[in-house]
């Protein structure tokens, strides 16, 4: 008798994706982050669902409903902090996952890479809207500042901002629609993630060497399921440590003050995972220029396959490109630090230098270095 997992129409799909999937035998722990992202997404949807049962999307009661969740709801505090810190874990895994794709040349799978970029943008939009929901000072002013950036759009800017706000300022209409979008977007992300996986399984996984692994593949289960469980254990250990011992470490103290349109916080800044883009935005004195740089800081990822001039796919055997990659990583960490600093000397100058370096590495230095390495291969 044939095994049901190989014949049943529905179970067969799961079998071909997670059990009998032919996988390269040499993929390292950097390939763990796909499954970790899936886990983070499920965790966020579940905790978010329970939070939505008690949350009120009204300007007069949103802040107190969060307080009620933490004080009165059974284990509400852990659900709230798991959701908040789960978002940080999500972005940490996202950045590592994207970095791995860049390092090992996974961007040559165009459909998978482009859907990944759409996923990144969607997750960023979802996280931004989620940050507005507690209706603290940083929620309100963050929403005001970021949505106001759209007013830089020529001709239709002001109308666009007022359309998004649902009025002439960030108010009840804005909060209600942000809650609606924040609820629906994770399910869209889930659909996109499935499509991402579908396209990946069309071509098969990349591997650290960057060469075809068709001659040497092993089944996903039990080899990589056990390997993924190790990564998952470490992720949950890190998340639970953060949630139970340092729940407010990554948050902003200003968000424990109810939103007040008449009182502006001294330093308006988003969550840590947006700081690199926020630093790029602030480094350009012109409003429209800053907004374009902000958008390009993410959309530049779509150009990476076009800028790939190397004869080798992976950076594993290209030391000069490796150096540039780690300089880029350090540059992003510098931008993250600058984004959290006040707009004053010397932070402005450091931010501008780091922003120029960020775009220069991707657009100019990486393709040039790859061409030099191609020449060196002939020697």
Curated annotation (Swiss-Prot):
Sequence positions that bind heme b b562: 83, 182
A GO MF label: ubiquinol-cytochrome-c reductase activity
SUPFAM superfamilies found in the cross-reference section: a domain/subunit of cytochrome bc1 complex (Ubiquinol-cytochrome c reductase) (SSF81648), Transmembrane di-heme cytochromes (SSF81342)
Binding-site residues for a ubiquinone, renumbered to this chain: 201
Residues where heme b b566 binds: 97, 196
InterPro entries recorded: Cyt_b/b6_C, Cyt_b/b6_C_sf, Cyt_b/b6_N, Cytb/b6-like_sf, Cytochrome_b, Cytochrome_b_C_euk/bac, Cytochrome_b_N_euk/bac, Di-haem_cyt_TM
CDD domains assigned to the protein according to its UniProt record, in alphabetical order: cytochrome_b_C (cd00290), Cytochrome_b_N (cd00284)
Cellular compartments annotated: Mitochondrion inner membrane
Cofactor dependence: heme b
Any one of the GO BP annotations: mitochondrial electron transport, ubiquinol to cytochrome c
Chief location of this protein within or outside the cell: mitochondrion
Pfam families reported in the protein's UniProt record: Cytochrom_B_C, Cytochrome_B
Further remark: Heme 1 (or BL or b562) is low-potential and absorbs at about 562 nm, and heme 2 (or BH or b566) is high-potential and absorbs at about 566 nm.
Function as written in the Swiss-Prot or TrEMBL entry: Component of the ubiquinol-cytochrome c reductase complex (complex III or cytochrome b-c1 complex) that is part of the mitochondrial respiratory chain. The b-c1 complex mediates electron transfer from ubiquinol to cytochrome c. Contributes to the generation of a proton gradient across the mitochondrial membrane that is then used for ATP synthesis.
Protein name (Swiss-Prot/TrEMBL): Cytochrome b
Organism: Daubentonia madagascariensis (Aye-aye)
Source organism phylogeny: Eukaryota, Metazoa, Chordata, Craniata, Vertebrata
Gene that this sequence comes from: MT-CYB
